[in-house]
C-alpha cells in the first residue's frame, strides 16, 4: 500500500498530518504474517488492538513533528478466517511492525493442487478488498466525525460569540441607564440646591427688609419721643417763667403818695384779686399739664411695649395707627398748653401795667 499524507487542523494551534504506512501480507503454512512499515515511529508511539465484533486489527500511532505539527496513522486490517485469535502476537524491529496470526490448521502449500492455490489467492484478494473497503469506510467515518466535531466547534464558537455580543449589549445598555439615572439624580440635586439657595436668599432679603422697616419704626418713635420731650421741656420752662413773673407782681410793693411823702405799702388785696382773677387760667394749665404728664407716662409705657413688639416682629397695623393717633393727640395737647400759657402771660402783662396807673391816680397828693 502506498503512503499518503494529508494535513488537518483542529483550530487549537496544533496541526495533524495523516500518515498511511505501507503494509504487506505473507501467507505461510503455519501463520499469516502482516508487515507494516512505520519509519520514524517508536514502539511507545503506536498501539495495536483486536476488535472482536468485526474481527479486525486496528493499528494506531502518532508522533510530534516541528512547528506544532503531529504525524498520525489509523489503519485497520481484517483477520483471516483460519486464524487463532488468542495467539496473535507482534514485534517491532527495524521500523517494521510484524503481526503474526497463527492458523488453526496448518496447510502445506507445496502439496496443494493448483485449484487450491487459486482459491487461496482469490481469498487473499477478497480479504484485501474487504480490508480496503473497511479501511475506506473507517476513514470516511473518521472524516465525518471530524467534520461533525468541526461543525460542533463552529456552532459552539458562534454561540459563544452571540452570548458575548448579547452580554456586551446588555452591559452597554445597563451602563447607559446608569449614566442616565446618575445625570437625572445630579440634575435633581442641582435643582433642589438652587431652589434652596433661592429660598435662603429670599428669606435673607425678607429679613433685611423687615430689619430695615423695624429700624425705620424705631427711628420714627425715637424722633417722636425726642420731639415730645423737647416740647414738654419748653412748656415747663415757660411755666417756670410765668410763675416767677406772677410771684414778682404779687409781692411788688405799692407806693402811696401822702402829704408826708410816699410810703411803700403792699396791697395784698390787689394781689389776692389778681390771684382770684387768674385762678381759672392756672387751673386750666395745671389740668392740661396733669393730663399731659399722664399721657406722656402712658405713651412711654405704650412705646416700650410697642418697641418690644417691633423687636419681636409682632406689631400690627392697628397698633401702628394707635401710635400715630397718640402722636397727634400729644401735639394737640402741647399746642393747647402753649396757647394757654401764652394767654396767661398776656393777661398778666396787661394787668401789671394797669395796676400802677390806678394806684397813682388814687394816691395823688392834695
Curated annotation (Swiss-Prot):
Residues 346-366 have a biased composition (Low complexity). Induction: Regulated by the transcription factors NAC045 and NAC086. GO terms for cellular component: plasma membrane. The keyword Manganese does not apply. The keyword Hydrolase does not apply. The chain crosses the membrane at residues 322-342. It comes from the Eukaryota. Disulfide bonds: none annotated. Expressed in leaves, stems, and inflorescence, exclusively in phloem-associated cells (e.g. sieve elements). Keywords: Cell membrane, Membrane, Plant defense, Repeat, Transmembrane, Transmembrane helix. GO terms for biological process: defense response; response to virus; transport of virus in host, tissue to tissue. Residues 14-121 form the sHSP domain. Residues 345-366 are annotated as: Disordered. A- repeats lie at residues 129-133, 135-139, 156-160, 206-210, 211-215, 216-220. B- repeats lie at residues 163-176, 178-191, 193-205. Residues 163-206 are annotated as: 3 X 14 AA repeats B of [IMA]-[RK]-K-L-Q-E-E-A-K-A-K-E-[EK]-[LA]. Belongs to the small heat shock protein (HSP20) family. This is Protein RESTRICTED TEV MOVEMENT 2. It comes from Arabidopsis thaliana. The gene is RTM2.
Amino acid at each position: 500500500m502506498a503512503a499518503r499524507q494529508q494535513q488537518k487542523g483542529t483550530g487549537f494551534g496544533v496541526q495533524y498530518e495523516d500518515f498511511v504506512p505501507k503494509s504487506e501480507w505473507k501467507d505461510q503454512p503455519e501463520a499469516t504474517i502482516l508487515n507494516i512499515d512505520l519509519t520514524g515511529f517508536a514502539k511507545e508511539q503506536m498501539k495495536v488492538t483486536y476488535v472482536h465484533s468485526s474481527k479486525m486489527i486496528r493499528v494506531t500511532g502518532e508522533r510530534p513533528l516541528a512547528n506544532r505539527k503531529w504525524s498520525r496513522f489509523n489503519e485497520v486490517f481484517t483477520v483471516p478466517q483460519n486464524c487463532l485469535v488468542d495467539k496473535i502476537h507482534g514485534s517491532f524491529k527495524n521500523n517494521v511492525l510484524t503481526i503474526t496470526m497463527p492458523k488453526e490448521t496448518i496447510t502445506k502449500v507445496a502439496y496443494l493442487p493448483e485449484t487450491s492455490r487459486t482459491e487461496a489467492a482469490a481469498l487473499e484478494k477478497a480479504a484485501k478488498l474487504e480490508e480496503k473497503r473497511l479501511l475506506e469506510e473507517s476513514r470516511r467515518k473518521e472524516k465525518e466525525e471530524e467534520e461533525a466535531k468541526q461543525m460542533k466547534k463552529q456552532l459552539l464558537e458562534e454561540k459563544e460569540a452571540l452570548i458575548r455580543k448579547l452580554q456586551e449589549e446588555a452591559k452597554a445598555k445597563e451602563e447607559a441607564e446608569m449614566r442616565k439615572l446618575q445625570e437625572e439624580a445630579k440634575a435633581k440635586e442641582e435643582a433642589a440646591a438652587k431652589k434652596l439657595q433661592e429660598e435662603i436668599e429670599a428669606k435673607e432679603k425678607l429679613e433685611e427688609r423687615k430689619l430695615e422697616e423695624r429700624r425705620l419704626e424705631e427711628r420714627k418713635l425715637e424722633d417722636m419721643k425726642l420731639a415730645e420731650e423737647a416740647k414738654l421741656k419748653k412748656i415747663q420752662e415757660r411755666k417756670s417763667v410765668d410763675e416767677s413773673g406772677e410771684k414778682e407782681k404779687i409781692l411788688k410793693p405799692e407806693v402811696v403818695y401822702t402829704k408826708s411823702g410816699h410810703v411803700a405799702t403792699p396791697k395784698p388785696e390787689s394781689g389776692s384779686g389778681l390771684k382770684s382773677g387768674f385762678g381759672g387760667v392756672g387751673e386750666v394749665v395745671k389740668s392740661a399739664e396733669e393730663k399731659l404728664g399722664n399721657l406722656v407716662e402712658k405713651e412711654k409705657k405704650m412705646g416700650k411695649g410697642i418697641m418690644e413688639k417691633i423687636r419681636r416682629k409682632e406689631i400690627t397695623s392697628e397698633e401702628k395707627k394707635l401710635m400715630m393717633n397718640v402722636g397727634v393727640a400729644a401735639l394737640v395737647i402741647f399746642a393747647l398748653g402753649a396757647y394757654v400759657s401764652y394767654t396767661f402771660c398776656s393777661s398778666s402783662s396787661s394787668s401789671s401795667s394797669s395796676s400802677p396807673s390806678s394806684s397813682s391816680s388814687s394816691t395823688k397828693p392834695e
